[in-house]
Amino acid sequence: MRIDQHSLKRRHVLSLACASAASIACPALAQNFPNKTITLVVPFPPGGTIDAAARALANQLSSLLGQSVVVDNRAGVRGSNGTSFVTRAPADGHSLLFSNLTPLAITPHMTADGNVINALAPIGTLAYGPQMLVSSKLNSVSDLRSMKPSLGHAGNGSLSHVLASLLSRSLGMRLDYKSYRGLAPLLNDMMGEQVGAAIVPVGAIVGLREPNSIKPLAITAPHKAMPGLPTFEQAGIGEATFNDWLGVLAPASTPASIVSRLNLTVNRIVQMNEVQDRLTSLGLMPQLSSPEQFGTLIKLYSNRMATVIRQEGIQIS
């Protein structure tokens, strides 16, 4: 299976430019920031897509801000551990969170951290991660209705678990779920035809040693990133559309001037060719935003996920 990484990047040039124009106006920048090492907390283990994107960001942040930027992986409880750590950090811009939407819009609805987003100040997005419906034995989305295969996911309370529930709702039928301890064992079993289908990040497929053994059936990206592959909407499963987002946040009381400076810096980084190339190689689509746009995005996704999690009774295992 071939991922057209040039198309992933090229189709977002215009949207990047438009979002950049919206981010130019800002308050006076903090003149004495940063004045020490910045810690970029990643609430997931080292080695994954989010960690790789964080390190690409950290390298450029250090160069542009003139201070060291250290990536600190604090995994646990679907991203809650690292996220909570940042909410308790000094609000001076030197402790930042780099995360996807899981600990911001999904996990809080299954833990006691239901208001975690109110304890954070969104700074801006780096990219979004389209999701892909894949299978090793189905040939089209219509086969889901006729064959009723099992749906794999990466563990109870995971993003792929929520997406499996969304897919069942979109199809109007209940499919059996098969839980795994992460995406790697799920995809290994799929290559052995031990599980029928799953919704996974495009980046998870990019990294496979034998990607041709898994067939893409549909993608959530709003524009076709792979020639001939339908979007979820085109395939009749639009309700399951979910694009994950990666972005930077700070403790809630961080001064607006520091948030503005960080937003402008992150937006500059997103527009660097070398960063865009790195992100697309990870199956991500570069996308910048204002702090307000990122905050609105998180709340929209959080409200949507809250409904699904409540109605489906999804819990963290």
Name every feature range the model reports, one short phrase each.
Residues M1-P27:
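N-terminal secretory signal peptides
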Residues A52, A56, N81, F85, ...:
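Extracytoplasmic/secreted proteins, especially bacterial periplasmic and envelope-associated proteins
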Residues G152-P230:
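Ligand-binding pocket segment of bilobal, Venus flytrap-like solute-binding proteins
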